């Protein structure tokens, strides 16, 4: 494994002085700031295309996320990057990366545990009584997969009789980067703490190397979930066959009332 040693302090100071000397301070772009006009354009674009409302109070959050995109690109500042990505010159990859950078990916295992209790105690018995072959569930804002895998654990535990129906889960998100994490199903051990011990023993496999503080959802459970990109603001989105259970609370909370009604 490569190691990268920090530059000595004096060396860093010399490099910093040289870099500053190349461009007068008055003309150096403010990489980490966004103009009010561009913030308004960004907020409007994100709300129109993803449904997520971005109030003015989020400006520093937006700057922090966009500055990473600027550093990974050829642009000198956030404003220059915004001018490009919100222009006709932007390609599909540009817009995908832009949306990936700005979407919120807050998620946990067993987030809102009362919802999963209700699924287990009320919904599942009702669906089992209907004698259907497959119970279909949808995690509508899957993020890195924790909600979908929680669903899978609850369903696997509640449908463990040979006479019970099978289940299938569709897990979607607009962010393609977090979907890649979700497909791998690998998580830090700390993130798995909310999972009950019995479920961890049954559905989670720790890394062979104890120095790696992570674990992976077992393959039979991963196989029950199909991950895919989906934008809830697309009026023609398709999830295939009708769903029996839909988890969408954790995305609707970021939408305005009118957008919530439109999605539902």
Located regions from the model:
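A short glycine-rich, Lys/Arg-flanked "PGG" loop and its adjoining helix->strand segment in the class I
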Residues: 261-264
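Alpha-helical elements of the RecA-like P-loop NTPase motor core of helicases
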Residues: 117, 149, 180
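Conserved AdoMet
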Residues: 2-138
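Short, thiol/selenol-centered motifs that function as redox-active sites or metal-ligating centers
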Residues: 32, 142-148, 251, 255
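Conserved SAM-binding loop of SAM-dependent methyltransferases across substrates and taxa
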Residues: 144-162
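Extended basic-aromatic, gly/pro-enriched interface segments that bind polyanionic ligands
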Residues: 140, 161-247, 251-259
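Conserved class I S-adenosyl-L-methionine
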Residues: 132-150, 170
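Short, well-ordered alpha-helices that flank and scaffold nucleotide-derived cofactor binding pockets
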Residues: 121, 125, 153-157, 184
């Amino acid at each position: 494994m490569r190691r990268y040693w920090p530059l000595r302090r004096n060396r860093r100071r010399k490099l910093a002085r040289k870099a500053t000397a190349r461009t007068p301070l008055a003309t150096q772009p403010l990489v980490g700031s966004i103009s009010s006009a561009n913030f308004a354009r960004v907020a409007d674009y994100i709300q129109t295309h993803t449904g997520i409302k971005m109030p003015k109070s989020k400006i520093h959050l937006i700057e922090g996320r966009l500055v990473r995109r600027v550093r990974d690109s050829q642009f000198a500042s956030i404003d220059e990057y915004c001018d490009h990505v919100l222009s006709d010159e932007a390609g599909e990859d540009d817009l995908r990366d832009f949306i990936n950078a700005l979407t919120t990916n807050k998620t946990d295992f067993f987030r809102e545990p009362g919802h999963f209790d209700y699924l287990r105690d009320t919904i599942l018995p009702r669906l089992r009584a209907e004698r259907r072959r497959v119970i279909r569930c949808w995690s509508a804002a899957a993020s890195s997969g924790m909600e979908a895998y929680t669903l899978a654990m609850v369903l696997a535990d509640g449908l463990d009789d040979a006479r019970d129906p099978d289940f299938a889960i569709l897990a979607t998100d607009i962010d393609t980067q977090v979907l890649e994490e979700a497909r791998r199903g690998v998580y830090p051990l700390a993130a798995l703490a909310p999972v009950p011990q019995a479920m961890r023993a049954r559905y989670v496999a720790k890394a062979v190397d104890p120095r790696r503080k992570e674990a992976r959802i077992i393959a039979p459970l991963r196989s029950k979930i199909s991950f895919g990109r989906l934008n809830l603001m697309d009026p023609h989105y398709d999830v295939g066959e009708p769903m029996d259970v839909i988890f969408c609370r954790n995305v609707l909370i970021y939408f305005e009332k009118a957008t919530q009604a439109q999605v539902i």
